[in-house]
From Swiss-Prot:
Organism: Phaeosphaeria nodorum (strain SN15 / ATCC MYA-4574 / FGSC 10173)
Compartment annotation: Mitochondrion matrix; Nucleus; Cytoplasm
Organelle transit peptide: 1-9
Main location: mitochondrion
Designated name of the protein: tRNA (guanine(37)-N(1))-methyltransferase
The gene coding this protein: TRM5
GO biological process, one term: mitochondrial tRNA methylation
Similarity section: Belongs to the class I-like SAM-binding methyltransferase superfamily. TRM5/TYW2 family.
Keywords, alphabetical: Cytoplasm, Methyltransferase, Mitochondrion, Nucleus, S-adenosyl-L-methionine, Transferase, Transit peptide, tRNA processing
Function (record text): Specifically methylates the N1 position of guanosine-37 in various cytoplasmic and mitochondrial tRNAs. Methylation is not dependent on the nature of the nucleoside 5' of the target nucleoside. This is the first step in the biosynthesis of wybutosine (yW), a modified base adjacent to the anticodon of tRNAs and required for accurate decoding.
Record's GO cellular component terms: cytoplasm; mitochondrial matrix; nucleus
A GO MF term: tRNA methyltransferase activity
E.C. designation(s): 2.1.1.228
Length: 441
């Protein structure tokens, strides 16, 4: 009943086409002071229109009454104004005591009423088979830019889809469609795109986890930490006073990362790097051993201009940067798993440090364990992810030349999100095996 009219032949959005009139009835409220009571009672008796997107209180259909503030309540279509058998007992009681009258009413709906899903479903034919993709509903949002990844069958409708999406999402000013896979066309993880709606303005600003990020969406990706992008993982961690070394090969991402470190005032805790991920894995382990950093943490004190502090504040604790990393995050699912060989012999070739001395950096000689590796990757979809978990562990084993199974201690494979009808993103977390970390190379 509330669906828009079908428009299968439409290729260019015509907003004026989506109009619909639903014949129904309305309760004319004779006294304005009774509107609230009548609405409550008729809602309880299920006489009002059962649609949360329609305001049931409307100006009276009689123009003279409407000018004087007259209102009516829209009733469900099953209520017929001249057939009392369709009225509920409550509606009859209110009519008999003179509180209201039941009149015919035309409910007019237009483009603004219908949702994105309703409009696109009215235009685009449904999938012919279960194997076909459903009409695209989701999109990635970065600031004012909505990012689509349309399948070929929807290309004839791409501009129409973009126009409707922007109409129904006020924060969206620009809609783009990705033309290739991130990370497959170039080393900087950028992608080709086409603008479907709005200006070609990719300079975005967004806020997440109490942090502000500014970057060019076309030139920099917002992912993290060996592939750190503009810092969406590194900077929130820095806000929590975690020492983070964040690397990205893309110079545009690196520039935005530096800017965002400054904007969010986390320079004491986040160290940016601009190099290849494989080189960063090895070199950062060496550099961190040589690096010394301690950050005093001061208690929060309220200052008054009229009564400035008389003594220099004293830190209540000092945070010291560890000599080894506790976690490595590799969030580039298209290729991150291929960087795992860089961890082979990570601590076997430290200048000035023998393998025996390197082993003493970790348990049982210290409280520090070997680092956890968190690598994102793609796989297929299933209801229980059992086959996918085994497949991912097998690939990790192949990359590290060390057997890894779902039963291995500290191994955890969890699904992050669906990215396509038959494709799912996973994050594989595992502790770097000792035989890998100290293998002679």
């Amino acid at each position: 009943m509330f669906a828009p009219p079908a428009a299968r032949a439409m290729k260019v959005l015509d907003r004026s086409f989506f109009k619909k009139t639903i014949p129904t009835s309305a309760a004319r409220i004779f006294n304005a002071k009774d509107i609230s009571r009548c609405r409550k009672e008729l809602t309880a008796s299920r006489d009002t229109l059962p649609n949360n997107r329609v305001d049931p209180i409307r100006p009276d259909v009689d123009s003279e009454r409407a000018q004087k503030g007259g209102k009516c309540l829209v009733l469900r279509p099953e209520v017929v104004h001249n057939d009392r058998t369709t009225w509920s007992p409550k509606l009859r009681d209110l009519e008999q005591d003179g509180t209201l009258g039941v009149i015919p009413f035309q409910l007019d709906l237009d483009y603004d009423f219908f949702t994105y899903s309703e409009i696109t479903s009215a235009i685009i034919p449904p999938p012919e088979t279960k194997q076909d993709d459903e009409i695209p509903q989701g999109f990635a949002l970065a600031g004012h830019v909505a990012h689509l990844n349309l399948r070929e069958r929807y290309w004839p409708y791409k501009y129409l889809i973009a126009d409707v999406l922007a109409d129904k999402n006020p924060m969206v000013k620009t809609v783009i469609n990705k033309l290739d896979n991130v990370g497959t066309e170039n080393a900087f993880r950028t992608f080709q795109y086409e603008v479907l709606h709005g200006p070609d303005d990719m300079n975005v600003e967004l806020r997440e986890q109490g942090c502000t990020f500014k970057f060019d969406f076309a030139k920099a990706r917002q992912y993290a930490t060996i592939m750190a992008g503009v810092g969406p993982f590194a900077i929130p961690a820095g806000k929590k006073k975690c020492f983070v070394w964040a690397n990205d090969l893309n110079p545009e991402s690196y520039k935005s990362l530096e800017d965002n470190i400054r904007i969010n005032k986390v320079g004491d805790f986040v160290t940016p790097r601009n190099t290849d991920g494989a080189d960063f894995i090895r070199q950062s382990a060496i550099d961190l051993l040589k690096s010394e950093r301690s950050i005093p943490i001061y208690p929060k004190v309220k200052f008054s201009r009229s009564a400035p502090p008389t003594q220099k504040p004293v830190p209540d604790r000092t945070l010291v940067q560890p000599r080894t990393f506790q976690h490595y995050v590799m969030n580039l699912p298209a290729s991150a798993i291929t960087f795992l060989p860089s961890f082979i012999g990570l601590y076997s070739n430290i200048p000035g440090l023998s393998i025996g001395e390197a082993k003493k950096l970790f348990a049982p000689h210290t409280q520090q364990k070997l680092p956890m590796i968190h690598v994102h990757c793609f796989s297929t979809k299933s209801d229980d992810n059992v086959a996918e978990t085994k497949e991912i562990c097998a690939e990790i084993s192949r990359q590290l030349q060390c057997e890894m199974t779902p039963e291995t201690p500290d191994v955890n494979i969890h699904d992050v999100r669906d990215v396509a009808p038959k494709k799912r993103m996973f994050c594989a977390s595992f502790r770097l095996p000792e035989e890998v970390a100290f293998r002679e190379i």
